[in-house]
């Protein structure tokens, strides 16, 4: 007798929660020190005459809590392509030519590391989720990555463009659903971000653009996600994903916008972004943790997208968080800057490494439950509930 639809459906689904089975990160070799960046930025964009603006930018960089950032764009390249250094010069072709090649390439570097840690043959990868804010092309970076890694042609791909800074949470939410609804699925998740599409010179009429120039940087991170790890071949979760939610914050229209134009990708930020996030964050926490009976936010380990120091400061104050709660987040902001969607995956990596180094009892700084937040255009907030594993 043929199996019933219910039996088929049950057989298709995994038994346990999705877990992160490997993490890898990569950055371009070229990096800039934040203390030196204002002088470099105003020189390379031929803007040294804008002395007041340069002072403002210096203050932004000083307050950013960033020590260094990695960037694919070098001084030599920018000198050869002056249109990218102007505030509003048509330059999309030049920018596109960079990102359609470099985004998948940097993604591959991170993916190779994640696959190595996972320790299984890449032929076991069933799904690819690729996320980037830049470089729309057909076929996309998901296809390029599949070719670069030599994955099976039958791998099931999903390409996410133009999401912005919350998307590190989005890819985890999607990977969780893919892994838990497809028995044996192993999902390669890649976030690869290159600022070549947003870099531009200063404008005294658009100070919000300068905020992005002070914060944004390049990086890629990759994860392998799967349910029911096969311990006989050495699969072991680093973190498990328990639930995932997305919401649009009230009264936040236009708080963060990005527009792809002939001049590249322009970013527009309202000052009140930290206020909007801190005002609404407790509602997201309540909805995520009430089912678990958790209401002490200091009992969680924290992985928050470091949009900028003001967001972290205001969230800490609003929730009464102890200073050490944002340690991993602030460390990644300091050493890498705001790498958009890749940031939270870098923070996951930093947290489990530091937890092991410090001899903590779990991958989550010795704690059992944690939260991962993504914030970005919308304002959109992604909330992922994480469960650590014993070390």
UniProtKB/Swiss-Prot annotation:
GO terms (BP aspect): flavonoid biosynthetic process; polyketide biosynthetic process
Alphabetical list of Pfam families matching this protein: Chal_sti_synt_C (PF02797), Chal_sti_synt_N (PF00195)
Pathway this chain belongs to: Secondary metabolite biosynthesis; flavonoid biosynthesis
Coiled coil regions in record: none
UniProt xrefs under PROSITE patterns: CHALCONE_SYNTH
Keyword Acyltransferase: yes
SUPFAM superfamilies on file: Thiolase-like
Transferase recorded as keyword: yes
EC number annotated for this UniProt entry: 2.3.1.74
Location of the active site: 165
Disulfide bridges in this chain: none
InterPro entries, per database record: Chalcone/stilbene_synt_C (IPR012328), Chalcone/stilbene_synt_N (IPR001099), Chalcone/stilbene_synthase_AS (IPR018088), Polyketide_synthase_type-III (IPR011141), Thiolase-like (IPR016039)
Keywords for the protein's UniProt record, in alphabetical order: Acyltransferase, Flavonoid biosynthesis, Transferase
Top EC class, one word: transferase
UniProt catalytic activity: (E)-4-coumaroyl-CoA + 3 malonyl-CoA + 3 H(+) = 2',4,4',6'-tetrahydroxychalcone + 3 CO2 + 4 CoA
A single MF term (Gene Ontology): naringenin-chalcone synthase activity
Family: Belongs to the thiolase-like superfamily. Chalcone/stilbene synthases family.
Known function: The primary product of this enzyme is 4,2',4',6'-tetrahydroxychalcone (also termed naringenin-chalcone or chalcone) which can under specific conditions spontaneously isomerize into naringenin.
Protein name per its UniProtKB record: Chalcone synthase
